[in-house]
């Protein structure tokens, strides 16, 4: 039977134990391999300050690499009676190496241990989100360029308003993602700071070398003040949640548009039948369930910052068990967002557009502004031109000129997609993921 790291000479009530452990054993599986990475950096530093012998370090690192491989394959489990991944890793080391395995916790608390686990996990997941956003972005830019000359109605108040184009529609969401990437970058920069060495939130009497662990783990810098490092629990999750919610907001709006444009009353876009679902009673149905679920999941993700804030917003300085509950909403959110991004990219790639929407005369009035502008350009006062065209429409005499010429930046005839791509590339170049990746490879080699 495994012993708890904090166990003394009394037994905790089983119901209290069940309630306080909660879902920790399950959720910590997300963090297991990152716990190993943190331990590898920590013990390397311990050896450098004389708290471990060189041969002890070599044996511990070798065994930690074995545990990492198990976790990386998804085979890591917390044994019965083990509270969390920290305890399980220490138990596995002790089972293999005896008392040597008990030395890895010197100068460390589970508080800074889980902080570093969360940061290592989160920065890895943020990179995967960034990669998925870029794939969707590229699909949108490609579609925007492909259909840049195909007009569609633009709407205000859900009323036909002015000419738009598929180039503008696809490109608008691409630029939205380029802006969202700035939020992801800010979240990554705030995440990629080392809390290790803050212990329970008040530091340690051991002469820890925090600069060394910062470099070993590929962090950009550290959370310098040990009290602030602990205060960062919850704050980091909230900041990342805001960035994820921003991406989700773009996805939700795009999914709503796609559902609406796909319905028979609009008929602007068509989804391949293999990307739709059917009805058990209506044989003609081809439902856009993928976009409906992207919309629902993305709307759910937009509540994530509020969920995190409501757990942490009335906590004073220091660690509290309340913070464990954040894991329940935070850790699974990455897979949900990645899934939505991947599905959106896949279905956007397959989407077909109706290139003859404007053959329908019901869209003729949206060219009225073009006519007003032409009359004004020819010298008629704008208000007189507006009234003249309005009266023609009311009398059923308006004859649209559908040959439009928009040339300013960001308009139908000048999408500026190359500028939008430059925005995205600039932001991507400033993440510097290679620092993280190289550090982790170096630890594991």
Language-model features, listed with the residues they occupy:
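Short amphipathic alpha-helical segments with heptad-repeat character
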Residues: 119, 123-130, 134, 141, ...
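Alpha-helix capping and helix-loop boundary segments enriched in small/acidic/polar residues
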Residues: 105, 110-113, 157-164, 168, ...
